[in-house]
Curated annotation (Swiss-Prot):
Keywords for the protein's UniProt record, in alphabetical order: Host nucleus, Membrane, RNA-binding, Viral matrix protein, Virion
The gene coding this protein: M
One Gene Ontology term from the biological process aspect of the record: viral budding from plasma membrane
Topology versus the membrane: Peripheral membrane protein
Family membership: Belongs to the influenza viruses Matrix protein M1 family.
Transmembrane segments: none
Motif position, Nuclear localization signal: 101-105
Name the record gives this protein: Matrix protein 1
Listed GO MF terms: RNA binding; structural constituent of virion
Top-level lineage group: Viruses
Residue segments, region Membrane-binding: 1-164
C-alpha cells in the first residue's frame, strides 16, 4: 500500500459516513494526484463544512497544507491553529515538544507512527500544531506518520464507543482501507484499459466499483459490509486480468 493510500485510509476512517465523507474522499484523491493545487480555496471550503469536529478539520487542514504546494508566505489558518493547540493544556504542549524532538530523528513513516502512538491525542494534535505553525520541521513522511497515529487513536476511541468487539486491526480502518483500495484499483483499471478490446468492460467494472464506494460512504455501512464489495470486485478483476494477462493489486 502506498504512503498516500495509507494516509487517505486513516484520515477517512475518522469522518462520519454521509455525503460529506464521499466529497472529502474525492478532494483527498485529487490533492494526492496533484489535481487540486489551490490551497487557499481548499482551506476555505474545509472551514465551512458542517458536521466535522474542529479536530478533524484541523487534521484535514494539516494534510492539505503538507500536500498542496503553496507560496512560502501563505497565511496559516486560525481554525486549524485552534484545533491543533491541544485544548490549550500546557501538559499537552510539553509532551508535544518531546515528541517533536523524537520525530526529528525519525525519517520513515512507520517509524514516526510507531513513536507517536505512545502519546495522547492531545499531545499528538499539539505536535501537529507546532509543525503547522512552522515552529519546527520534520520530513513529510514523519508528518504523515504523526497524522495516521492521531487518526488511529481517534478511530480506536470511536470503535470502543460503538461497543463492538476489538480485533487486532481496527474494523473502521479496515473497512475504509477496502474502499480506498477499491477506488485505487478502479482507477488503475481505467488507466490500463486504454484502447484494448476489453476497454469498455474495464471502464464499466471500474465505474460500478466507484459508484458502490460512493454509495457506501454516503449511506454509511457496517464495517464488515465492505468485505462483500471486496469479493465482488475481486471476481470482476480476476476475470478481467486473465483476459488482459496482468496482475492487479490484491485487497487485504
Amino acid at each position: 500500500m502506498s504512503l498516500l493510500t495509507e494516509v487517505e485510509t486513516y484520515v477517512l476512517s475518522i469522518i462520519p459516513s454521509g455525503p460529506l465523507k464521499a466529497e472529502i474522499a474525492q478532494r483527498l484523491e485529487d490533492v494526492f494526484a496533484g489535481k487540486n493545487t489551490d490551497l487557499e480555496a481548499l482551506m476555505e471550503w474545509l472551514k465551512t463544512r458542517p458536521i466535522l469536529s474542529p479536530l478533524t478539520k484541523g487534521i484535514l487542514g494539516f494534510v492539505f497544507t503538507l500536500t498542496v504546494p503553496s507560496e512560502r508566505g501563505l497565511q496559516r489558518r486560525r481554525f486549524v491553529q485552534n484545533a491543533l493547540n491541544g485544548n490549550g493544556d500546557p501538559n499537552n504542549m510539553d509532551r508535544a515538544v518531546k515528541l517533536y524532538k523524537k520525530l526529528k530523528r525519525e525519517i520513515t513513516f512507520h517509524g514516526a507512527k510507531e513513536v507517536a502512538l505512545s502519546y495522547s491525542t492531545g499531545a499528538l494534535a499539539s505536535c501537529m500544531g507546532l509543525i503547522y505553525n512552522r515552529m519546527g520541521t520534520v520530513t513529510t513522511e514523519a508528518a504523515f506518520g504523526l497524522v495516521c497515529a492521531t487518526c488511529e487513536q481517534i478511530a480506536d476511541s470511536q470503535h470502543r464507543s460503538h461497543r463492538q468487539m476489538t480485533t487486532t486491526t481496527n474494523p473502521l480502518i479496515r473497512h475504509e482501507n477496502r474502499m480506498v483500495l477499491a477506488s485505487t484499483t478502479a482507477k488503475a483499471m481505467e488507466q490500463m484499459a486504454g484502447s484494448s478490446e476489453q476497454a469498455a468492460e474495464a471502464m464499466e467494472v471500474a465505474n460500478q466499483a466507484r459508484q458502490m464506494v460512493q454509495a457506501m460512504r454516503t449511506i454509511g455501512t457496517h464495517p464488515n459490509s465492505s468485505a462483500g464489495l471486496r469479493d465482488n470486485l475481486l471476481e470482476n478483476l480476476q476475470a478481467y486480468q486473465k483476459r488482459m494477462g496482468v496482475q492487479m493489486q490484491r485487497f487485504k
